[in-house]
Regions:
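A composition-driven surface/loop motif
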Residues: 1-330
Length: 330
């Protein structure tokens, strides 16, 4: 049942229309898998156990009715790189573009990559939960539609795992929550929400939390790391970097929000970034929010535009409270 290549009957709570490439799930559980080549380099693990492999159908439409489940909760465990290369990792949905619609919910639980795809789109009133122990969902592009909800969660703290990795652009009109407990001291990761292009929040809500306090000692992670961030149409973004370092008594240098190019906040947009670290001997060096490019806040306050990197202290955001109208950074 894990390879979409034929028409199924409805005995398992699902049906497939090959003409429209539409898979309908109705109170369905898919917990069987097929073994597939991992397509990794030589010397790295060779196989995935894939619960739903749709790579051969192009764009797959998944209609959700009722409560649905794909995966196996017992696969939520760590597997080190030194493991036998012939031991498969568990992967949830592997496909090209996957479009979710309908009024139901879907929980995907897999050891790594709840979804690995060329694109993810949600519409209707669907509710997705994408849970892994190791690296989370990875896709080239993603659109979270109005009225829909997506939760991406990575539970492992062994390495610098991300919860959601969007290689290009991510647009959020609905609700998106991303949380990672990944933990590596003074590394470029972990990141709860990693966006290689533009994170665009228009009327939607994004909350991202990197919770290194639940990991190994000395961990701080990015809540959001994006090339560009745009907030408008009443959209809101909240990001948290929760970490500590009792070994070094130093802040680990990861902001709640890091934007490598430009930040734009239009009228009605809301931005909140906070680090939570009980031991901060170097708090002036790093902060809750960092932008390497240009601040464009003309829609919020016409007098405000920054053309160089700006860093806040982790706790004291007073430098911004009188500058960015309707925006709190603390």
């Amino acid at each position: 049942q894990s390879s979409i290549s034929s028409t199924y009957d409805t005995t398992g709570g699902f049906k497939y229309d090959a003409d429209t490439k539409t898979l309908t799930l109705r109170n369905c559980t898919i917990d069987t898998y097929t073994k597939a080549s991992s397509e990794q380099l030589s010397g790295i693990f060779k196989y995935y156990n894939v619960f739903l492999d749709s790579r051969n159908v192009g764009t797959l439409n998944i209609v959700l009715e009722g409560r649905n489940y794909i995966g196996d909760s017992s696969s939520l465990k760590y597997m080190p790189a030194a493991s036998d290369v012939n031991t498969p990792r568990y992967l949830g949905i592997w496909g090209n573009t996957v479009r979710f619609s309908g009024s139901g919910s879907l929980t995907v639980e897999a050891q790594t990559f709840p979804i690995q795809s060329g694109g993810i789109e949600t519409s209707g009133s669907v509710d997705l939960t994408l849970r892994s122990y190791m690296n989370g969902t990875v896709t080239r592009s993603m659109a979270v539609g109005a009225g829909t909800s997506v939760t991406a969660e990575t539970k492992g703290n062994n390495l610098d795992f991300y919860a959601l990795n969007v290689k290009n652009n991510l647009t959020v009109n609905g609700t998106l929550n991303a949380t990672t407990k990944g933990c590596v001291y003074q590394n470029d990761y972990p990141v709860a929400l990693l966006v290689g292009g533009t994170l665009r929040v228009v009327g939607g809500q994004v909350t991202a939390t990197s919770d290194g306090r639940n990991g190994n000692d000395g961990c701080q992670g990015y809540g959001i790391k994006a090339n560009a961030l745009e907030i408008g149409g009443g959209g809101s973004v909240r990001a948290y970097s929760n970490g500590y370092s009792t070994k070094t008594s130093q802040y680990d240098g990861k902001e709640a929000i890091y934007v490598s190019s430009n930040l734009t906040v239009d009228l009605g947009g809301y931005l909140y970034a906070k680090t939570q670290n009980p031991i901060l001997s170097n708090e002036n060096e790093n902060g809750a929010l960092k932008v390497n490019g240009r601040w464009d806040l003309s829609g919020t306050n016409g007098d405000t535009a920054y053309t160089k990197a700006v860093i806040t202290k982790p706790v004291n955001g007073s430098i911004y409270e009188n500058v960015i109208l309707g925006t709190t950074v603390s």
